[in-house]
């Protein structure tokens, strides 16, 4: 197991290890688009609210599973969530400027 210092500023190996462990624990075999999911959660965290990011990630996973699962379903749900977050932020910005 890596020590705490290894986790600070070096997300790559930690994320890879965590995702592998989580997939094993959850009994799933799926390639994870880490950059895409992190981009989506960034848009949600900054455009909506920080707590909305993990909740939206859950909803993306649920939507993908409901659509039959697989990388394409995840990518589509992820794309929709990211676009919604961008629209949400733009609409809120317009409301505040009025």
Spans of features found by a protein language model:
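C-terminal binding/interaction regions
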Residues: 2-8, 17, 22-26, 39, ...
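Amphipathic, hydrophobic secondary-structure cores in small proteins
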Residues: 29, 34-67
């Amino acid at each position: 197991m890596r020590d705490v210092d290894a986790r600070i500023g070096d997300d790559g190996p930690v994320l890879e290890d965590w995702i592998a462990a989580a997939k094993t624990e959850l009994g799933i075999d799926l390639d994870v688009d880490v950059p895409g999911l992190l981009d989506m959660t960034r848009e949600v965290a900054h455009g909506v609210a920080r707590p909305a990011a993990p909740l939206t990630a859950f909803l993306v996973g649920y939507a993908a599973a409901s659509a039959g699962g697989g990388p394409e379903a995840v990518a589509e749900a992820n794309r929709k969530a990211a676009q919604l977050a961008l629209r949400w932020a733009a609409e809120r910005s317009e409301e505040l400027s009025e």
